[in-house]
Every structure is written in C-alpha cells, then in structure tokens.
C-alpha cells in the first residue's frame, strides 16, 4: 500500500481559521479542514493573520475527498526540502516565496525552543496542540531543540549533591581505614 496523500513534515498553508470557527464546524468533517487551513487562537490570528488569508466561508463546506486530495497536494508543494530528526530535536530547511508560518505536526511542548536561521523565534501552538513558526521569504533553516522541563534543575541538584556524596563516601573510607589500623 502506498499513501497517495502523504505529506512530508513541515509545510505552509494559504488559509487560516480561528479556534472558534473550527469548533463551530461539524465534527466528522473537521479533519479535512486541517489540510486546508491552519487553526490559530484568536490572539495569534490578530498577530499572524497578515501572513495567511482567512478561510472563506464557502471553503468550509467543500470537504469532498477530491478536494481533500488537492489540499494534500498543495501542502506537499509547500513542504520543507529537508527534515531530519537529531538527538536534540529536529532540523528542517525550506524555500518560501513569501513570509509564512511553517507548520510541524509535532505536539507542542514548553521544552522546545525554535531557531529560524539561527535566531530564536516564538513557537505558536496551532491546530489544537501542534507547532508552527514564522519564517521569512527565501531559503531558511529551522531547528527545534528539546530540553525537558526540569532538566536544568535536575542538573543543578546533581552537581550540588555530587560533592556532598564524595565527602560522605570519603569520610566512610577514611573511617574504615582508621578502624583497620586499631
């Protein structure tokens, strides 16, 4: 079996709709809308709506399989040219004809930090829990670095506890040596 509607990781949209508009749609057809439009919070629609076109009302009802396959083809056409997982997160490259939000179907987590062309950038929580970043026009590199919550604290505690443990172990080794002499 080969999925003819496969979409690579990392792609852009032409349209957006707000979470309220998305929630007002009929539940069985919502998944088709996710191929056509990026779902933004009301606040993100105000801040980033300039990079996308609001989804026309007529587009909310054209949810046929034929249209779905066309939406998949449109997303493939705007997909990243490179996507690689690495030990820290993932790396992607893309060429965009205009500034746009690059969407990744990776669950949003506060542990991620995103860099576009080496500059830290805001990660948007879109499509009810996935991620997107704003990218400028042209060829861009995108890096997401993941560091779990609490890792810095755990490293600090470990480093602080290490000397205490060494002193504790050293004391008992010294005490044991002292007892053997007597």
Residue ranges and their predicted role:
Residues 2-70:
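Catalytic cores of secreted or luminal carbohydrate-active enzymes
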């Amino acid at each position: 079996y080969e999925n003819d509607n496969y979409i690579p990781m990392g792609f852009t949209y032409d349209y957006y709709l707000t979470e309220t508009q998305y929630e007002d749609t009929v539940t069985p057809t919502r998944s088709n809308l996710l191929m056509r439009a990026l779902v933004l919070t009301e606040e993100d629609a105000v801040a980033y709506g300039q990079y996308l076109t609001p989804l026309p009302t007529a587009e909310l009802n054209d949810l046929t399989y034929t249209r779905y396959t066309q939406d998949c083809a449109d997303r493939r056409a705007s997909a990243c040219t490179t996507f690689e997982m690495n030990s820290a997160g993932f790396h992607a490259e893309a060429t965009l004809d205009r500034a746009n939000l690059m969407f990744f179907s990776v669950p949003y987590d506060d542990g991620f930090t995103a860099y576009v062309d080496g500059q830290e950038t805001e990660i948007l929580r879109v499509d009810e829990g996935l991620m997107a970043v704003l990218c400028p026009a042209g060829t861009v590199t995108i890096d997401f670095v993941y560091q779990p919550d609490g890792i810095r604290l755990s490293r600090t505690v470990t480093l602080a506890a290490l000397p205490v443990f060494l002193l504790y172990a050293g004391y008992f080794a010294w005490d044991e040596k002292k007892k053997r002499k007597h």
